[in-house]
Curated annotation (Swiss-Prot):
Expressed in rosette leaves, flower and siliques. In the N-terminal section; belongs to the PMEI family. It catalyses: [(1->4)-alpha-D-galacturonosyl methyl ester](n) + n H2O = [(1->4)-alpha-D-galacturonosyl](n) + n methanol + n H(+). The PMEI region may act as an autoinhibitory domain and prevent untimely PME activity during transport. The active site is at 380 (proton donor), 401 (nucleophile). It comes from Arabidopsis thaliana (Mouse-ear cress). Its main location: secreted. Glycans are attached at residues 119, 172. Coiled coil: none annotated. InterPro entries: Invertase/methylesterase_inhib, Pectin_lyas_fold, Pectin_lyase_fold/virulence, Pectinesterase_Asp_AS, Pectinesterase_cat, Pectinesterase_inhib_dom. This is Probable pectinesterase/pectinesterase inhibitor 6. The record marks 379 as: Transition state stabilizer. GO terms for cellular component: extracellular region. One of its GO terms (biological process) is cell wall modification.
Length: 554
């Protein structure tokens, strides 16, 4: 009897052994996801160079993944600040061509936004900074660098702009942002493991998220009935469903002088000066044609612009690349402030197909919503530049690459009209510009109708990891049997992700589609669900809060 007792370990010893095993396994799972050295990043030599010269460098063999993340992001932010300072000094040179000066001004604004995005991507930034938020910010920063270079491409200055632009510095910053994104993604995966294995003790930064009701992948935005991001107005609930919203407008714009202002930009400028304490500011724009170029800056958040309906309230302009404006600056309406909402407005660029790039609307607004709006143009009509965006019940008209950019965007229940292009042009609906595999970006066209005036392709890859999905759409007869068009030769055909799921209509047959490695006929619900509002856009909280109708599933 006594002998048997000695051979049988006490229950508490079993428990301790099991806990120890779980802890070791948990730590192993956690460490497998972290990036803790430059050699694990996409661009190790750039990482080594800037980390070794960083005043923040405190690396040693014991540096953990979270610390390494913070050091990489901080080093990258230092580079962005230095580059902004350098480019700011270059614009003073009187010998610069006016086109080069235009491109430099774009770069300055984009660097300023990049610094802000890098600041947002730090884990220490605010209690509402989730892993997905941080990846979104860094994806936007990558888009900014690409857009800076595009300004020089617009004017065919890429072969000579090294004379007046710090090209290598810019390239290194772009690579450093890519490194920051890779490290951030790895840290996010580690945080997910930490939630699964709380015994690791690495739950410091994930507790904030789960305490706000966002413990799963599909609820990363921290939205619940009680807790929203600090900039999100607490009163912003079902606002678009309120028939009295226009009567409650803070500012009214009317061409006939019956409102507070006669131009939209005047109202926007006034909005910037009003103390709001995170309240939604509503601008009601009465029916009329407003010939102006409107800019809503990054600092002007939570603005809602409501018109009297499509083709009743019209904002129109004609800036274009041919006449000396960069694609970025050509937008008739440009919005960068987060939380922007538009309803019942037509945004238009009338430059015409012969003027090439001419944007009707550009948006870099995170958590932006466009409801029952129309976007009219030809080449480059709708510039979904960066961040998270949702469009519902909208009409989009164009010819070449007329839905383009590097946002994470879903267009739901929209009508897409491909106009007749110029002679020698080919109609392409999308040109999504995801550049790095770790970016969260892509376009999803869901439950929409595609009508075409001539043969039209669903899209082509503007950048190497372009991602676009058409699902449950009605595709017109003139959609090309091949479906998709190459950009140039074999560029991106293996690294892009193009998908189709459950489409109908005369142009929906996939039997003649391209055979590229990156093209996918999505056959399972599991794969298709990756591209829903809930999973791809994390929109089941922030979109629902606005009152816009939304299908968060398939």
């Amino acid at each position: 009897m006594d002998h048997k007792i000695l051979l049988t370990p006490p229950k508490s010893l079993y428990t301790k052994c099991i806990i120890t095993i779980i802890y070791v396994v948990s730590i192993s799972h956690l460490n497998a996801h972290f990036i803790t050295s430059c050699k694990q990043t996409p661009y190790p030599s750039v990482c080594d160079h800037h980390m070794s010269n960083s005043p923040l460098k405190t690396l040693d063999d014991q540096t953990d993944g979270f610390t390494f993340h913070d050091l990489v992001v901080s080093s990258t932010m230092d580079q962005a600040v230095q580059l902004h300072r350098l480019v700011s000094s270059l614009k003073q040179h009187h010998s610069l061509h006016k086109h080069a000066t235009s491109a430099l001004f774009d770069c300055l604004e984009l660097y300023e936004d990049t610094i802000d995005q890098l600041n947002h991507s730090r884990r220490s930034y605010g209690q509402y900074s989730s892993p997905h938020d941080r990846q979104t910010s860094l994806s936007a920063a990558i888009a900014n660098q690409d857009t800076c270079r595009n300004g020089f491409r617009d004017f065919k200055l890429t072969s000579s702009y090294s004379k007046y632009f710090p090209v290598q510095f810019h390239r290194n910053l772009t690579k450093s942002i890519s490194n920051s994104l890779a490290v951030t993604k790895a840290a996010a995966e580690a945080e997910a493991v930490a939630e699964k294995y709380p015994s690791t003790g690495f739950t410091k930064f994930s507790k904030q998220r789960s305490s706000a009701g966002g413990g799963s992948h599909r609820r990363l935005l921290l939205f619940s009935d009680e807790k929203f991001p600090s900039w999100f107005p607490l009163s912003d609930r079902k606002l678009l469903e309120d028939s009295k919203t226009t009567a409650k407008a803070d500012l009214v714009v009317a061409k006939d002088g019956s409102g507070h202002y006669t131009s939209i930009q005047q109202a926007v400028n006034a909005a910037a000066k009003l103390p709001r304490r995170n309240q939604r500011l509503v601008i009601y724009v009465k029916a009329g044609v407003y010939r102006e170029n409107v800019v809503i800056k990054k600092s002007i958040k939570n603005v809602m612009v409501i018109g009297d309906g499509i083709d009743s309230t019209i904002v129109t302009g004609n800036r274009n690349v041919q006449d000396g404006t960069t694609t970025f600056r050509s937008a008739t309406f440009a919005v960068s402030g987060n939380g922007f909402i538009a309803q019942g407005i037509t945004f238009e660029n009338t430059a015409g197909p012969e003027k090439h790039q001419a944007v009707a609307l550009r948006s870099s607004s995170d958590f932006s919503v466009f409801y029952a709006c129309s976007f009219k143009g030809y080449q480059d009509t709708l510039y979904l530049h960066s961040s998270r965006q949702f469009l519902r019940n909208c009409n989009i008209y164009g010819t070449v690459d007329f839905i383009f950019g590097d946002a994470t965007a879903i267009l739901q229940n929209c009508n897409i009209y491909a106009r007749k292009p110029m002679s020698g042009q080919k109609n392409t609906i999308t040109a999504q510009s995801r550049k790095e595999p770790d970016e969260t970006t892509g376009f999803v066209i869901q439950s929409s109708t595609v009508a075409t005036a001539s043969e039209t392709y669903l899209g082509r890859p503007w950048r190497s990891h372009s991602r676009t999905v058409f699902m449950k759409c009605n595709l017109g007869a003139l959609v090309s049997p091949a479906g998709w068009l190459p950009w140039s030769g074999s560029f991106a055909l293996s690294t892009l992700y193009y998908g189709e799921y459950g489409n109908t209509g005369a142009g929906a047959s996939v039997s003649g589609r391209v055979k590229w490695p990156g093209y996918h006929v999505i056959k399972t619900v599991t794969e298709a669900e990756k591209f829903t509002v809930e999973n791809f856009l994390d929109g089941n909280y922030w979109i629902t809060a606005t009152g816009v109708p939304v299908n968060d599933g398939l």
